[in-house]
Amino acid sequence: MAKSTSSAPSQRMLRVGEQVRAAITQVLQRGEVLDPLIENTVISISEVRMSPDLKIATAYVTPLGVADHAAVIEALNKHAKFIRGRLGPQLRQMKYMPDVRFRDDTSFDNYQKIDSLLRSPEVSRDLDRDADDEE
């Protein structure tokens, strides 16, 4: 059977990514990471992307209510090995425990930019003009 050459994640990568996301969320909710910056910040994990070999998990996080996202991301990456160790009980079925890497999730900012562009007067004028042409 030939391997797929597409860059889309496989069902297995998506399933494992969701399991890792849930496990990291539980570790953070229970307050197991003893770092004041992490303990005092609400952290939203929007997605975890797995490498094809399932050995690297990249977690996209958004620290809420904090101006300095980079400091929170740095603190999470500093404690990544500890967090990886705490994932073990919830991910027993995995042959290898993935290395966890944290990245800032910029997708919400991108959505806001697109929304503001769509609401701009120039774009709404063009959309109105297109609607008039169709009639």
Swiss-Prot record:
The name this protein goes by in its record: Ribosome-binding factor A
Pfam (any one): RBFA
Any one GO MF annotation of this record: ribosomal small subunit binding
Taxon lineage: Bacteria, Pseudomonadati, Pseudomonadota, Alphaproteobacteria, Hyphomicrobiales
Role description: One of several proteins that assist in the late maturation steps of the functional core of the 30S ribosomal subunit. Associates with free 30S ribosomal subunits (but not with 30S subunits that are part of 70S ribosomes or polysomes). Required for efficient processing of 16S rRNA. May interact with the 5'-terminal helix region of 16S rRNA.
UniProt entry tagged with the keyword Cytoplasm: yes
Organism: Rhizobium meliloti (strain 1021)
Family (UniProt): Belongs to the RbfA family.
Localization in the cell: Cytoplasm
